[in-house]
């Protein structure tokens, strides 16, 4: 029982997205020999291997047959819709659902790079609360997502109701000032 719990905890640590610069995507150098853990005939070794993924070009994505393509698309859809950040779940999940079937291998690599970004940072960059780094802003998937988000934002929210560029959207409540320095319009 203790061995089983230890293996489950090791699996959770390896799969954790809290580890900076880590991903659960199998790296291109998959010909290395990794320890293989068998449980009821299921190979958990290289499948859950994590490695530093500073560049999206490190991924070995196999879209050669329909089964591999289906699995890859399903994983990407799941990762984009189940981030735990409601706004990103909706925006990113819908965009991926609309566009993932038409992506080639480079598009999938760019999408994986975007999916590996932290939620708060990605949201601030998509909504122009902060400037994204050059590596992110040059990503074609990020650019398309950013364009969609800004188009929807401009369509549904008047500019005077938004925070100034580079500023957080929500101003914290201050019991002493009681909102005297609040924006002229909007509920920020």
Swiss-Prot record:
Keywords of this protein's UniProt record, alphabetized? Chaperone, Mitochondrion, Transit peptide
SUPFAM superfamilies cross-referenced by the UniProt entry: YgfY-like
Q: Where is the transit peptide?
A: 1-21
Any Pfam family: Sdh5
Cell compartment(s), UniProt? Mitochondrion
Task: Establish whether keyword Chaperone is in the entry.
Answer: yes
| Gene3D superfamilies per UniProt | Flavinator of succinate dehydrogenase
Q: What happens when the gene is disrupted?
A: Inhibition of primary root elongation and early lateral root emergence.
- One term under GO cellular component: mitochondrion
According to the lineage, what is the superkingdom? Eukaryota
PANTHER family found in the cross-reference section: PROTEIN EMI5 HOMOLOG, MITOCHONDRIAL (PTHR12469), SUCCINATE DEHYDROGENASE ASSEMBLY FACTOR 2, MITOCHONDRIAL (PTHR12469:SF2)
Q: Any idea what job this protein has?
A: Plays an essential role in the assembly of succinate dehydrogenase (SDH), an enzyme complex (also referred to as respiratory complex II) that is a component of both the tricarboxylic acid (TCA) cycle and the mitochondrial electron transport chain, and which couples the oxidation of succinate to fumarate with the reduction of ubiquinone (coenzyme Q) to ubiquinol. Required for flavinylation (covalent attachment of FAD) of the flavoprotein subunit of the SDH catalytic dimer.
Which family does the entry's similarity section mention?
Answer: Belongs to the SDHAF2 family.
Protein known as: Succinate dehydrogenase assembly factor 2, mitochondrial
Q: What is the lineage of its organism?
A: Eukaryota, Viridiplantae, Streptophyta, Embryophyta, Tracheophyta
């Amino acid at each position: 029982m203790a061995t089983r719990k230890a293996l489950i905890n090791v699996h959770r640590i390896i799969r954790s997205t809290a580890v900076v610069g880590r991903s659960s995507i199998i790296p291109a150098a998959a010909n290395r020999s990794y320890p293989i853990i068998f449980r009821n005939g299921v190979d958990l070794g290289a499948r859950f291997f994590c490695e530093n993924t500073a560049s999206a070009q490190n991924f070995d994505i196999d879209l050669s047959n329909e089964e591999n393509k289906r699995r890859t698309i399903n994983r990407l859809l799941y990762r984009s819709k189940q981030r735990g950040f409601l706004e990103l779940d909706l925006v990113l999940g819908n965009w991926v659902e609309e566009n993932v079937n038409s992506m080639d291998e480079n598009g999938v690599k760019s999408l994986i790079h975007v999916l590996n970004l932290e939620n708060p940072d990605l949201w601030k960059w998509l909504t122009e609360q902060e400037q994204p780094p050059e590596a992110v802003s040059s990503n074609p998937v990020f650019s398309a997502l950013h364009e969609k988000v800004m188009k929807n934002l401009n369509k549904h929210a008047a500019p005077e109701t938004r925070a100034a560029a580079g500023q957080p959207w929500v101003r914290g409540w201050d019991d002493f000032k009681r909102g005297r320095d609040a924006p002229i319009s909007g509920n920020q």
